[in-house]
């Protein structure tokens, strides 16, 4: 393939000036063969399986990073949902399992490990219940473990008993990590239609239909897309879409190249490339900045949802041409604390929780990294989750909620997490009650569009 000098310079510019990086190389590992009734034996089995497969992951990704000169920000692991593989264990809680995952992650040198997870969209098994009840202590006593719970699908509807439970779990997790502004909640996500091959945290787990070991890659390039849009001379929206498509193709192609080389060197399957635009707290490396480059005064004003729909669609169209295997979440992320433009919009009063909810109907993945007052009730948190699950269920898409009820904080305050997690201004929630609705429980039935056979 002929590569022109200007293409090489363009790639260098993306990395040096526009914050382009491979956000994550995530290794998925199957733990189903590790099951045992003795919790100590089970913990030993999963530790050996994870460290056996992942011992060369960090070294290999760093070699590939040096080979191509493309930064790889995070190395991560996703495992089979622990609620499934630990159900046979004779134990009352799974905190020791979370600590084993954390130790394995530490020993192989990765950034995060996902899969402290349960799939409860149609009902809750004893193993699911043990895992859910273990989440607050598990996340408080570990550094790298991430938890996720799938409570809804388009085919099954919404398990409102699980939704009600998760409101309390989010509150307890915030309280258990109150010394760090409730950071445990940044490692807990509640899903509708959770994908089995998502490389991004906190929602990554290794699905039941996956191979024994696989490499999935997530890219990041809002700064590159932002620059591409701003360089256009008085474009119409069709021309903006075309520019985003071309840029997404280039970004995705680099991710594909890196992912395949890592998987080749590790001798494991290449799974998927996740096309998602993942922002960082860096100025300009922002999804909100792209929307403002299209002509909005600030993210959150009228027209924001339409601009985001254009962006999300163009990213998918361009990215899908660059990879044979696209998967995961694949869209544009709107995590408030991780996006400098979103933070600014909230502080200006332009971006509300209700507007963010509308935006989630046209992008991936949901209400993400949003700080709310610490005294918000569990029922209100559950109701916010239920609203977001309904959007996912009806629209046949992945949606999620990652809320931080910041202990001791009120509207106007902010919480500082640092690093990629950034800073979150505390946002207003409705002062009116949803408690009676949430207390009814049961299941919201699957919609008519679930009947596809």
From Swiss-Prot:
Pfam families, per the entry? DUF711
Question: What is the superkingdom listed in this entry's lineage?
Answer: Archaea
Mind telling me which SUPFAM superfamilies this protein's record contains? PFL-like glycyl radical enzymes
Instruction: Kindly give the InterPro entries that the UniProt entry links to this protein.
Output: UPF0210
Q: Which residues form the signal peptide?
A: none
What family, per the record? Belongs to the UPF0210 family.
This chain's protein is named: UPF0210 protein Mbur_0828
Organism name: Methanococcoides burtonii (strain DSM 6242 / NBRC 107633 / OCM 468 / ACE-M)
């Amino acid at each position: 393939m002929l590569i022109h000098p200007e293409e090489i310079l363009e790639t260098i510019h993306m990395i040096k000036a526009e914050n382009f990086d491979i956000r994550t190389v995530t290794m998925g590992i199957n733990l189903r063969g590790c099951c045992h009734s003795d919790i100590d034996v089970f913990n030993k089995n999963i530790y050996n399986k994870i460290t056996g497969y992942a011992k060369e992951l960090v070294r290999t990704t760093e070699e590939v990073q040096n080979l191509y000169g493309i930064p790889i920000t995070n190395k991560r692991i996703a495992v089979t949902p622990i609620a499934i593989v630990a159900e046979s264990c004779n134990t009352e809680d799974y905190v020791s399992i979370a600590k084993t995952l954390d130790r394995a992650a530490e020993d192989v040198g990765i950034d995060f490990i996902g899969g402290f997870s349960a799939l409860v969209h149609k009902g809750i098994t004893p193993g699911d219940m043990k895992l859910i009840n273990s989440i607050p202590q598990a996340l408080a006593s570990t550094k790298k473990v991430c938890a996720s719970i799938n409570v809804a699908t388009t085919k099954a509807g919404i398990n409102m008993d699980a939704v009600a439970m998760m409101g309390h779990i989010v509150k307890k997790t915030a309280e258990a990590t109150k010394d760090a502004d409730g950071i445990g909640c940044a490692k807990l996500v509640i899903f509708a239609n959770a994908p089995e091959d998502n490389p991004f945290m906190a929602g990554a787990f290794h699905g039941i239909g996956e191979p024994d070991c696989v490499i999935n890659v997530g890219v990041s390039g809002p700064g590159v897309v932002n620059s591409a849009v701003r360089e256009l001379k008085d474009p119409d929206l069709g021309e903006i879409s075309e520019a985003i498509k071309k840029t997404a193709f280039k970004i995705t192609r680099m991710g594909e190249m890196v992912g395949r080389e890592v998987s080749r060197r590790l001798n494991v399957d290449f799974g998927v490339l996740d096309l998602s635009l993942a922002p960082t707290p860096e100025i300009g490396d922002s999804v909100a900045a792209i929307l403002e480059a299209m002509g909005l005064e600030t993210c959150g004003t009228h027209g924001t949802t339409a601009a985001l729909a254009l962006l999300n669609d163009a990213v998918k169209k361009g990215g899908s041409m660059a990879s044979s295997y696209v998967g995961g979440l694949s869209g544009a992320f709107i995590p408030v604390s991780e996006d400098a433009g979103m933070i600014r919009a909230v502080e200006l009063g332009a971006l509300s929780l209700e507007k963010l909810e509308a935006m989630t109907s046209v992008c991936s993945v949901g209400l993400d990294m949003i700080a709310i007052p610490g005294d918000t009730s569990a029922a209100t948190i559950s109701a916010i989750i239920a609203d977001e699950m309904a959007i996912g269920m009806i629209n046949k898409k992945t949606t999620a909620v990652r809320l931080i009820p910041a202990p001791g904080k009120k509207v106007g305050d902010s919480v500082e997490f640092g690093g990629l997690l950034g800073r979150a201004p505390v946002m207003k929630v409705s002062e009116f009650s949803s408690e009676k609705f949430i207390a009814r429980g049961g299941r919201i039935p699957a919609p008519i569009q679930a009947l596809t056979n």
